[in-house]
């Protein structure tokens, strides 16, 4: 039986206002709506989120707000443009008492992390094919968060809120 649940959420659809740096781009109306739907799905189908690890970009912070997930959040600059290895290093530093962790980040780091942790099976094929904005991958973790540096997890669900 898994001891922990990892939820990977790609930020909502962003807007592209003139003169706004990439890091500061806000969510588009669709992104706001779908981030709310993502939060609804997470609350309905997953254990309560104990902690959140979120990129510092405006669109990830706004995605977390729109999701209405109420849990202590840690914001990490390293998640902005992060590789799967960098995302895994951030996850590994999570408090061992956390049983359900939500990570809000970007492409390619979020889908690549899901695939690095569980590269086989039908869910991995779907994720490799397409991981759009506001998509969610959930994984069962049998060891500690630190174990994810060199141990796999098992993909349990992949959801695209629309």
Regions found by a protein language model. Give the residues of each.
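A structure-centric signal for secondary-structure junctions around beta-strands
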Residues: 3-4, 98, 133, 152
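Active-site-proximal alpha-helix that buttresses catalytic centers in soluble enzyme cores
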Residues: 2-86, 110-111, 116-117, 122-124, ...
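A short beta-strand-loop-alpha-helix capping motif that often carries His-Thr
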Residues: 104-109, 139
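Generic beta-sheet signal
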Residues: 6, 96-105
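Short, solvent-exposed aromatic-acidic interface loops
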Residues: 153-162
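Short, surface-exposed amphipathic charged segments that create phosphate/polyanion-binding patches used
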Residues: 88-94
């Amino acid at each position: 039986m898994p001891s922990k649940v990892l939820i990977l959420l790609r930020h909502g659809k962003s807007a592209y206002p003139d003169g706004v740096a990439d890091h500061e781009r806000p969510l588009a109306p669709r992104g706001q709506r779908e981030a709310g739907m993502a939060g609804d799905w997470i609350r309905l189908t997953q254990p309560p989120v104990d902690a959140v690890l979120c990129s510092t970009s405006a669109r990830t912070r706004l995605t977390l707000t729109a999701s209405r997930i109420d849990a202590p959040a840690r914001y990490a600059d390293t998640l902005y443009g992060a590789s799967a290895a960098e995302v895994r290093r951030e996850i590994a530093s999570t408090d061992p008492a956390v049983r359900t962790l939500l990570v809000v980040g970007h492409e390619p780091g979020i889908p690549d992390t899901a695939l690095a942790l569980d590269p086989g099976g039908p869910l991995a094929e779907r994720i490799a094919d397409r991981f759009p904005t506001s998509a969610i991958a959930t994984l069962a973790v049998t060891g500690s968060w630190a174990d994810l540096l060199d141990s796999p997890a098992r993909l349990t669900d992949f959801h695209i809120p629309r």
